Amino acid sequence: MIEFVKMHCNGNSFIITNDEKITKCSFEKLNQDKDLKFDQLLIYKEDDTSLKDLKIFNRDGTPALNCINGKRCIKALLNGDKPIAKNIKATVKINAYKELLDGFTYVDTTNYHIVWESDNLVDDDLENEYQKTGKFFNSDNFNLSIYKHDSDNKFLIRTFEAGVGETLSCGSGSSATAFVIFKKNPLLDKIFLNSSGGQMICYKKDDNKICSEANTEIMNKSKFDEREYF
């Protein structure tokens, strides 16, 4: 039996476990079970408080390099917080930033992000935009975030993640987008990013770091027989 915790951060959902046997399961079968469906699978060691050995897998089984919202959830879990934890902080280092053609911006948060501003966020076909962007840059190893200015220091955001699809929220995508917004609006040092899953607060922290805050929630603690998902 594999013990797990299912959590989410602004709707970005995770299965969290320290049992590596789960990697032998069919990710397709796991995601057909509503109690096990996830955006990312996180495998951590209980004594690894820095999460340096954290293993991250996308919904389609491909590995991911980083997962800010997932780490935020594990942090809340290790802190022994109640089912809903408020304003869990995370800091992201920006490894690279480059303005590209046609209004695109490349941001490296260990995960690779393409960010651009949209005039009509709600009606954008994000999957189609992701495919077109991938063809334009000849790559599928990136996440796409589009954003729109709402009012004052409030912005709307949508993110399409490689190996997952559109998610209700994305921590590294929001951090990358916040970095772009701060670059374009140097008078801002704090913004509110609203996705379909909820609100994330982002702050400037040094020249190459973004600090963010968001809530986490434990959805379920349970176990399952891995043999049913081979």
Stretches with model-predicted labels:
Residues 1-93, 97, 115-230:
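A glycine-rich beta-to-alpha transition motif near the start of alpha/beta enzyme domains, typified by
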Residues 98-118:
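Surface-exposed beta-loop interaction hotspot
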